[in-house]
């Protein structure tokens, strides 16, 4: 696994796990804002642009990041955040290692498995993968994701560099992710975020996570869509993160 690193090695460590189909630039602005006060590490998830291997499973990605933390930071870091697929990987890490971090920010992580979505992914992407690499189609898709315009070039370039197989595998993995019983043993302070305008499945996932993690805090973000918090509202996101860790 490849990593982008910002900040000073002597500072507390924050790890940012990007969303599926994106890459390290998902958190670029956040990392730039925080680098004077923390060491920021952004793993490039397997199968994504800039990675060094194909995507296999959410568990494999979680295992690799846990090993990285063990090797470099003594088994625990200050805070880990994750968006969507990155949020699922974070939940998997917390399920395996209850004290992998002191604080966690989980944004829009689906935990309601859907066999229908799983079944549809392969035939749909089999037919439209060629379109995804067309700039006009990519612009339409980008607008539907409601990301801020300045991220389009990164999005288009990285979407074109992803293989069809990697897209299919990570989407299928994400569609079937579910809460592990061991997640309830987690001792990290967990903050859950979901946009008010997200799908019913995503809103239900956030509430189910909140029920499972009795001491967690659930934030339903007014007017926001999927990924809007970390990608489109950097100032608010950084303010929230700093407020969480200020008592460290």
Language-model regions, residue ranges each:
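Short beta-strand/loop motif that positions the catalytic acidic residue
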Residues: 186, 192-194
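Conserved alpha/beta-hydrolase catalytic His-Asp/Glu region
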Residues: 116-117, 131-184
């Amino acid at each position: 696994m490849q990593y982008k690193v910002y900040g000073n090695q002597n500072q507390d460590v924050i790890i940012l796990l990007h969303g599926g189909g994106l890459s390290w630039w998902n958190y670029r602005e956040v990392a730039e804002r925080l680098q004077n006060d923390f060491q920021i590490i952004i793993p490039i998830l397997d199968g994504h642009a800039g990675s060094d291997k194909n995507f296999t499973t959410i568990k494999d990605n979680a295992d690799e990041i846990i090993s990285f933390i063990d090797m470099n930071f003594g088994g625990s870091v200050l805070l880990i955040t994750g968006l969507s697929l990155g949020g699922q990987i974070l939940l998997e890490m917390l399920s395996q290692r209850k004290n992998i971090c002191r604080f966690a920010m989980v944004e829009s992580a689906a935990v309601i498995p859907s066999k229908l979505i799983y079944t549809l992914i392969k035939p749909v992407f089999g037919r439209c993968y060629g379109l995804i690499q067309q700039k006009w189609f990519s612009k339409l898709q980008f607008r539907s994701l409601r990301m801020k315009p300045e991220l389009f070039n990164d999005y288009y370039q990285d979407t074109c560099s992803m293989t069809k197989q990697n897209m299919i595998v990570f989407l299928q993995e994400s569609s079937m992710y579910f809460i592990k019983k061991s997640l309830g043993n987690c001792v990290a302070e967990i903050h859950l975020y979901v946009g008010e305008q997200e799908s019913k499945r995503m809103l239900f996932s956030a509430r189910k996570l909140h029920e499972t993690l009795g001491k967690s805090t659930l934030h339903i973000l007014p007017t926001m869509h999927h990924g809007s918090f970390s990608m489109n509202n950097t100032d608010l996101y950084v303010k929230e993160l700093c407020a969480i860790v200020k008592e460290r």
